[in-house]
Amino acid sequence: MTAQSTSLTQSLAQLDPEVAAAVDAELARQRDTLEMIASENFAPRAVLEAQGTVLTNKYAEGYPGRRYYGGCEHVDVIEQLAIDRAKALFGAEHANVQPHSGAQANTAVYFALLQPGDTILGLDLAHGGHLTHGMRINYSGKILNAVAYHVRESDGLIDYDEVEALAKEHQPKLIIAGWSAYPRQLDFARFREIADQTGALLMVDMAHFAGLVAAGLHPNPVPYADVVTTTTHKTLGGPRGGLILAKEELGKKINSAVFPGMQGGPLQHVIAAKAVALKVAASEEFAERQRRTLSGAKILAERLTQPDAAEAGIRVLTGGTDVHLVLVDLVNSELNGKEAEDRLHEIGITVNRNAVPNDPRPPMVTSGLRIGTPALATRGFGDADFAEVADIIAEALKPGFDAATLRSRVQALAAKHPLYPGL
């Protein structure tokens, strides 16, 4: 047997025990802890299987029926399924399922619709926006003239009057509605009105809340926007990747911007996993999971607004949530964001530190937390479980917390909802 054929048939554990051991350790971590990073989720086993198939071997530059390589008849079927399912799920006229990530999807939209130096208007990163919406250190802030709108200091909500005033002043070519850390629904009708008043195109980045949209629990931006981008993980719960939805008249530009504009060969194994995830997202089981996601976030926000939490300097930004995440302001707490993240990690809950508007601390420290419920809802958590998690978090962020007791409560919840049994 040749060395080549040996490597072709060996298992991961046989061929590379170091990587296999790290993968096993990560599976154990996911099983034994509570994942509450708002952008993370657990992909269905069928999604994992699709992504681990022989499709990883296939190059397929181009689009279904128009490839630059032979032997694409089967990947054409899969990619067309993904396209059709995305269009049906969100009511879109056009879908491109090839972007490798949400950032790549946003890049492709800019490449398709804008020229270097054009003006864009997006939510300030420090107020909950995203790097790709015009941050100065990101390509979007280097190549484009980025103007930022903000949330109001009084209530933490987007100031739509400011959005309108800035749009009239700067005449952006593209207005971006979307966020990475904002706990309320967006007023897409108002954004559309402002775009129409100023002759701008409207892009909605729904990466965080796409799953809620699919389940009918959040307004659908597709009827309002010229282009919608999203990731396929987060609340959608699929593989890590991107997706673009657009009006039909923009479809050719979008496709050309993705390939050959920004990418070469698409990742057909990931596109297959996207197709599977989009099928799941059209099911009642998925909608029920999203209802628990939303309910869990509201339960968490309610617990963290109780008097004992307030006395510990804990404040919920905007006073609550309409989505899958809660933003916690710790400016008046004994903890900064990094310390709070570490404390929760110590007891087995994974979250991420997050800047709050006008944060006095540096980005690697911050004064806040972003806490999400999608992964736990996928794991099967219901209202009673979320109430227990919320109380554990509240107790952990207060002075004099009992790490051992709280860790035991976390372990009990993890054991109650086993993850990937038999994997």
UniProtKB/Swiss-Prot annotation:
UniProt site (Plays an important role in substrate specificity): 233
GO biological process: glycine biosynthetic process from serine; tetrahydrofolate interconversion
Annotated catalysed reactions: (6R)-5,10-methylene-5,6,7,8-tetrahydrofolate + glycine + H2O = (6S)-5,6,7,8-tetrahydrofolate + L-serine
Residues engaged in binding (6S)-5,6,7,8-tetrahydrofolate: 125, 129-131, 249
Keywords of the record: Amino-acid biosynthesis, Cytoplasm, One-carbon metabolism, Pyridoxal phosphate, Transferase
Alphabetized Pfam families for the sequence: SHMT
Function: Catalyzes the reversible interconversion of serine and glycine with tetrahydrofolate (THF) serving as the one-carbon carrier. This reaction serves as the major source of one-carbon groups required for the biosynthesis of purines, thymidylate, methionine, and other important biomolecules. Also exhibits THF-independent aldolase activity toward beta-hydroxyamino acids, producing glycine and aldehydes, via a retro-aldol mechanism.
UniProt name for this protein: Serine hydroxymethyltransferase
Taxonomic source organism: Thermobifida fusca (strain YX)
Lineage of producing organism: Bacteria, Bacillati, Actinomycetota, Actinomycetes, Streptosporangiales
Name of the coding gene: glyA
